[in-house]
Amino acid sequence: MRNSDCKTRWRFGVLAALAVTLVAFAPQLYFSLSKGSHWNGAYAQTHGDESVYASYLNALIDGRPRRNNPYSGRDDSPEHPAAESYLSVQFLPPVLIATTARLVTVSSTKAFMALTVITAFASALAVFWLLASILKDSRLAAIGVLAVLLASSANLIAEYLFGLGAANNYLPFLRRYLPAASFPIMLIYCGLLLQMLTATSKRVASASVVSAGVLFAVLVFSYFYHWTFAVVWTVCLAGIWLAVRQHERKRVALLLLILAGFMIAAGAPYFVLISRLGATTGEAHFMAASHKPDLFRLTELFGVLIVALIGFMVSRGRVKASEPTVIFTLACAVTPFLLFNQQILTGKSLQPFHYEVFIGSYTTALAAFVAVILLWRGFTVTSPAVARILLTLVAGGAVLSGSAEATLMTRRQLPANQIRDDARPALLRLAQIARQTKDGSLDTKSVVYAPDFIVASSISTTAPQPVLWAPYLFVFPDVTLMEDKERLASFLYYKDVNFNNIDQFRLESLDNEQSYYLSSLIGRGRFNPRLSVNWQPIAADEVHLALDYYRNFVATFDRTQAARPLVSYLLLSADDPVKLSNFDRWYERDEGEHVGNYILFRVRLRS
């Protein structure tokens, strides 16, 4: 364990990256092979939010402007300028992916499949490079890759096994296109910053700080939770470094000033874009006012253990507090405390679980791995043979953990993915129709009504036509929360949904879909306690008000409401007919076009 190789042996990193990539792509591989010749080319959605990212990406591939709403069909134009959305502000990944997709003529579906492979492989190599530069041991770094990327979210398996809930974010770093696209960049930024601080050559230090500054700018326009994490982590790293390596203060301060210049240069235009966000953005994304401390998240608890372990080793003289590896580890361990408690000073909290799920768990796992290796090196408690066995067990356990997450991910999403794939031929037909307009323009006005919740979410991932309602319609600033609520009520009314005989004191008796609909009528995000630090359980009087709203909506529904928005297409499964007496009261259909397992009707409002 004491012997280290100063030269990075990339073959170990490549092997680890191949293992991670295989686990990452397994859900797609299984899905495609399980459908065999009946696979219609749909990507295997693995995380709940991927449909909104795929929809926005598909709109960009179609050549629509950066400020667009793929669900409503409303795009930015000189006549109707659109506000910024959280997707249009984080534009670098989708614009780059869309540009590449157009150049090589691939769809958003194929782009998502490719992104999984690219992200998994690149992230693994980034972790390997970072650990190899810290530990000076390529074999250990390769094992660390598996531990960090495949076991960081192992707690989700425990939650599943003990019946504490089924997570929606297994192997979360792979969620496309965010945080997947910026995840390896975040890791490389960390490595460059460490390289900047430890470089003995001015040329290397200068190159590192410039590279880190450029990557920070990329993060700023890629993913909010990554660039804000980078800022806090940089402050922690710089603060600890300056405190324990005082003899380097002048040199380090100069480098940090250069980095700060890059940060300010990137932040200035970013905050201009932020100032142009829609008025409902904060509410739509569950911005909460709170000064309440948040001290008991898993990453924070592990952070305490890591700091205690480092403190123990320093007190025993096994490591020095001034060692770069120790400083790096401490910075990773301390950062979550600042991130999860910044609201004590700012009074604002924005879905902080994203820090834990999409970056904090990985940097904490990385710090834990480094701390354990430092402990092992400082206290030679086992023979080299036993050490090799233990490390093999760590690697095997990590692969097993990642495989278990991939399996749970596949199992959870399989029914919905099958529906998406069955509907794909009809969605491709819609996309074809949208390009057959008289003036040659793309049809982004003809609204599609798909009563199936999953199909409604999937239409915009392939076709440019807007939809009556979809779960993520409300996150775009052109749609107010009231409009979203009305469109949801129309969506439910058309397919004859009623909430009769619902016990407002026993909502747990509802199935997941009904529960989602009802909670959304009460208020967006009320179904998920993780979305806001101020979340409160739904009260009986709120249920009563929502039911009254829906009953009144149904009772007063008229032709004016039926035309808001005007529906042009109806998409139904041929194998699972839905009662649509309310829809047929207001719209008349043509004979329908059979496309695969679906029927596409052209409809018009009755006179």
Across the structure, where does each feature detected by a protein language model lie?
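Signature aromatic-anchored transmembrane alpha helix within multi-pass, membrane-resident enzymes
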Residues: L257-I264, L375-A406
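Transmembrane catalytic cores of multi-pass membrane glycosyltransferases
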Residues: D49, L215-N341, L345-P352
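Membrane-interface alpha helices of multi-pass inner-membrane proteins
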Residues: C190-L192, A207-F224
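Active-site lumenal/periplasmic loops and adjacent helix-entry segments of GT-C-fold
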Residues: L22-I185, F224-T228, T407-N417
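Hydrophobic/aromatic-rich transmembrane helices and adjacent perimembrane loops
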Residues: T228-W233, S349-T380
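Extracytoplasmic
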Residues: L57, R388-M482
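Start-transfer (signal-anchor) and selected internal transmembrane alpha helices
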Residues: M1-S34, L390, S607
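Luminal/periplasmic acceptor-recognition loop/helix of membrane-associated glycosyltransferases
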Residues: P466-L570
